[in-house]
Amino acid sequence: MRKENLNSVINWICAALACFALMVSMNADLSGISAEAAGGGLWTLLAANIKKLEYILPTFSYRDAFFALMILFFFYKVPCRWPEYVPRLSCRIPAVLAAFFLVFGYSFRYTNSWDLIFMDSFHLLISVVVFAGYYVLAVRLFQMVIRYLCKKAQESNTSCGKWTTLLFETHAFAGPLLVIMIFWSPYILAKFPGASMPETLAEMRQFYWGTINNYYPPLHTIMLSLLMQLGNLLGSYTLGFFLNLVLQLAMLLSAFSYGFLLMKRWKTPYLFRYLALGIICMTQFFPMESTVVEKDIPYTACVVFLVLLLAELVRTIKDSEPLSKKQIAGLILVCLGTAGFRNEGIYLVLVSAVAAIAYGWSVIGKENLKKWKSILVAFLIPVVLILGYQKVLLPACGVEDNGPKEALSIPFQQTARYVRDYGAEVTAEEAEIIGKVLDYENLAELYDPITSDPVKYTYHAETTGELLDYFRVWAIQLVKHPANAVEATMNNAYGWFYQEGYTQNYMMTSRIDGQDVRWEINQPAKLAGVRQVMERVAKLLSRVPVLNWFENAGMVSMLLILLVAVWIGAGKKRYLVAVSPLIVAVLVCIAGPTFNYQMRYIMPVMFCVPFLAGLFVQSMREL
């Protein structure tokens, strides 16, 4: 009885902490509360902190009271129960990360630093309490989700209606494909012949002006431009642009449909299949971004295929038959596409190849050597071809190397922030060495906390020795002020894990930016009204709660982290092989040049989310 009372008290304390955290995040502007005065004695300090509390508390309203009651009711009705075979740490560690990024993300969002946490004792205390509130709420939510998914894993599919059978069983590939096309057709019509972005046109300029380099993936540059040429031969460049849109949509929708085909094999509950279809059809970011002609869409399609193929490989690893020629060809093609359509795709392929080959050897290497060799061939061939393409073919064709600067965003941002904050400590020798690599004289002014592009574009090192000298200086400065370096990296990458950062309707307006180009791409004036309506529809859908979670980088990243933690805790580590491309994709985002609400960088993870619930349920059915 005493233990039950203690648990009840702890539960209500957790509920109160969660209420406080949410109320502060929704109402208080902590950036407007100045640091406390250093002098004045105890009573003056106490009065100052009470004044700061007044700044927070009066913002609460009857709506906040109603919301607080809902939180209290949630904690009262949802007990903290754990599946027997999932250790509690599997939810607690992701909850710690979620709370950490919510607290630190808030500070970086408003001050580009962690000053709102470490400004003074008052801010630190508020941050600790808010962190605790977010943590207990995240733990309760995560365990509720995992418990529900584990429960569904133990249930068998009930009988379904005629239309469900037709959609998900009889026509498991074509059915979802048709539904997605129906829902996406207004977006396709509104953006005809397709929306563009500056990088798209820059790729075509490289092709037509004969100055191709590997800043943009040459494979996509050539494919894009050849289809433009084909369209021109058939009548117009507008048609060529539309052919590019058709090709990338065909790749992406085929990947989605293959996911539904696999969910049929996995016997995924129909509820999760409908949810997956609903996410793809109704989340405006999916069709809005997919109708922009860009390298990210075919790249994302290949990554979705790769994740699904790896998932099926893990599921069927113990089958006696080796991989068929069709399976090997599929893996080779998607690996080539993943590495060919984005430069960082090579990292996804290499990690996936190592993970799949190593896992295959550990499970069937001695028992079924023939099947393991088929896995080895399926991944070794694309890796060899990719390396030959990048290291031999492209240089032989005169494709210029863009240099290492794309991979150096983290140290460059750390150096720029160091120069801005501790420029007086930089010696003349250090300044000279940095100046041989970056524009030292203007580095402090060029530094943008949320993107490395302004600094990165000043890279001009001519020799490897200059770069090595720079890294020596960078290491010295890192040791002198490590906190400054951590701040620089977090400031540039926190948004990938910050759940309050939403896409700002990126590429919302249909447009073709064709300045200084040799072709004409025309959007029909008759479709102007359709474009206007669909723009408003997309903006409306982006504001629908729950639906807009699936276009939130922080949400999808935390979902991936949660599944990884549960798989590890539940002894299902083999399924990390399936999501290894997504894990690497998130790491690439961290090392990349910017967050700045450009969700296309994390699209591979976002577009795989509809199938992760089905994959998780399938994994938890296995002994």
Predicted regions and their residues:
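Membrane-interface anchor segments at the N-terminal boundary of transmembrane helices
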Residues: 51-68, 239-243, 491-579
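Transmembrane-helix signature of polytopic, membrane-embedded enzymes
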Residues: 84-95, 173-175, 259-282, 301
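Specific aromatic-rich, kink-prone transmembrane helix
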Residues: 140, 208, 300-318, 335, ...
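Extracytoplasmic catalytic/substrate-binding loops of multi-pass membrane glycan-assembly enzymes
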Residues: 191-203, 211-227, 234-239
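Transmembrane-helix motifs of polytopic, lipid-linked glycan transferases
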Residues: 246-267, 305
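Short acidic/glycine- and proline-prone juxtamembrane loop motifs at membrane-interface regions
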Residues: 288-299
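Membrane-proximal stem/loop segments at transmembrane-domain junctions that anchor or position
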Residues: 396-526
